[in-house]
C-alpha cells in the first residue's frame, strides 16, 4: 500500500475540494493518504490525520497543492527524508510546479504505473555564527538572502570564498542562490539564469553602490563566508523568502551546498526554456 502525503495551501484550495478529491482518488486506488490533522478534520477524514514529521518522513511521495511558495516550504521540510514531491499548481504559472490541477489524476495514474522520473535539485545550507558560536542554521531550495530593512542604511558585507577575499559589498544586501533560485530574486537583482539541474552557487549583490560589483558563480564545493562589517540596526537573513533571523555587526554567515536534495517528480517532458520564455513574458 502506498502512503501518500497530501499537503494543500489552504489559501489556494480554500474549500479543500481539490484536497478531498485527491484523498478520494488515493483511497479508491488502495493507498493511504496522510494529512495534516487540522485539514483531515475539516474534510471529515480524521483517521488519516498525522503529525507533520510523520507525513514528511513516512510518505512514499508527497502531493503539494499550491504554488511555488508551497513547494519551497514543503521542500525544506521533507529534504532530510528525501521524500519525492509532485508539485501541483493551483495558482499562477510557476517554475517549480510540474502540473496543473486539471492534469493531476492522469499524472497520478502515470506515477502508479511507474511512468515518471525524479529530478534532483541542489539545496543550500546556511549557518549563522555569533560570538564564535553557531546560533541557527537554515536550508533553502531557492536562496539565502541578507537584506537591510526599509529604513536602515546600506549594508557593508565582506564576502569570502574558501577564505579567499572576494569583495566588500556596499549594497542593500546579498543573495546566494541555487540554480533553481537563479530565476527568482537573484534574476531580479541582475543575476544569471542557470539551468536548474546544473550544480553551482550564485552570489549576487542587491543594488550595489559600486558599478563593478556583479554576480559571481562558484563551484558547489566552495564555502561562502559573509561577514557583517558595519553596524546596521536592521539586517535580516531569510531563506526562500519564508524564514527569517535578525543578524548584527560582526555576525558571520557560512553558506555551502547542502547534503540534502529536493526530489521533484516529473511526469511530463516539459522544456525549461519554454517555461522560461513564458515566465519572462509575464514579467
UniProtKB/Swiss-Prot annotation:
Q: Which UniProt keywords apply?
A: ATP-binding, Cytoplasm, Kinase, NAD, NADP, Nucleotide-binding, Transferase
> What is catalysed by this protein?
NAD(+) + ATP = ADP + NADP(+) + H(+)
Q: Which Gene Ontology BP annotations are present?
A: NAD metabolic process; NADP biosynthetic process
GO cellular component term, pick one: cytoplasm
For this entry, the protein name equals NAD kinase
Which HAMAP family did the record assign? NAD_kinase
Q: Does the keyword Transmembrane helix belong to this entry?
A: no
Spell out the subcellular localization from the entry: Cytoplasm
Q: Does the keyword ATP-binding apply?
A: yes
Q: Which cofactor does it need?
A: a divalent metal cation
* Name of the encoding gene: nadK
Q: Which Pfam families match?
A: NAD_kinase, NAD_kinase_C
Q: Which SUPFAM superfamilies match?
A: NAD kinase/diacylglycerol kinase-like
Active site (catalytic residues): 68 (proton acceptor)
The similarity comment for this entry is: Belongs to the NAD kinase family.
Q: Which InterPro entries match?
A: ATP-NAD_kinase_N, ATP-NAD_kinase_PpnK-typ_C, NAD/diacylglycerol_kinase_sf, NADK
Q: What is its EC number?
A: 2.7.1.23
